[in-house]
Amino acid sequence: MTEPAAPPTARRLFWWPLAWLGLQLQLMGLGLNSLAWNGVALLLYPLLPRALGRRIGRAMIAYGYRMFWTIAGYSRMIRLDADVLDALRDEEGLIVVANHPSMLDAVMIVARLPRAACIMKASLAYNPFLGPGARLARYIRNDSAYGMVQCAVRDLEEGGQLVLFPEGTRTTQAPINPFHASFAIIAKRAQVPVQAVFIDTASPYLGKGWPLWRLPPLPIRFTVRLGRRFAPPEDHQALLAEVQAYFAAGVQRGAYDS
């Protein structure tokens, strides 16, 4: 005779801690990988010329993030479909703007765009997990609005890409938070196009207010879509209004409920 299957409640009690541990180990691996690279970046920063340091720094950050997504994919706990971003990989002078549902949004976009820079809080420049690598990659600090715009324009003129989340923080109100104008100002000053990117998910995981220790429904699914390409603007306020309306109409939340 075969033994009866364990009741659903018992299976959940057994499975839940394993799933929680697996997810935490993946996040821990991302952090440890970042810490290890930042130790190397700290040594390379004073030795490498600016252009070479920028290229190596960005490529290594993208590589580390791709490793995270590869492991997450094998675990089948987090499923990411971001292949469409590969079409942008080699473009020069491009601003990529996206909605911001999760703490992992920059990780999923930068993993596919090794020439891209992000704008980071000035305080993060001294974070041991992020600071040395970000400085080597010449990520852009937001010490001041004027300095941030000037550095971003210079980076774009040198062939870089810029990843921005115009909501400024993770989404807290449906469909999107009000957009900040920085991306539009930079696009006008640099006269570069703006590529809209949608991140679709039904999962609340690592959204605003979601604690790291809390296990969400699994699997967690993220799908990245390419949206419209906006031409270099003459009027940054008009571009801001147009892009915000476009995202408000195009964001898909709850599309992957199962």
What function would you assign to each model-found segment?
Residues 2-10, 20, 24, 146-258:
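Non-catalytic C-terminal accessory region of glycerolipid acyltransferases
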Residues 38-66, 74-75, 90-144:
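Catalytic core of membrane glycerolipid acyltransferases/transacylases, capturing the structured
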Residues 77-79, 115, 136, 159, ...:
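A generic structural signal for alpha->beta connector loops
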Residues 79-80, 141, 162, 194:
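Hydrophobic beta-strand scaffold residues
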Residues 88-89, 133-134, 155, 186:
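Structural alpha-helical scaffold elements that stabilize or flank donor/cofactor-binding regions
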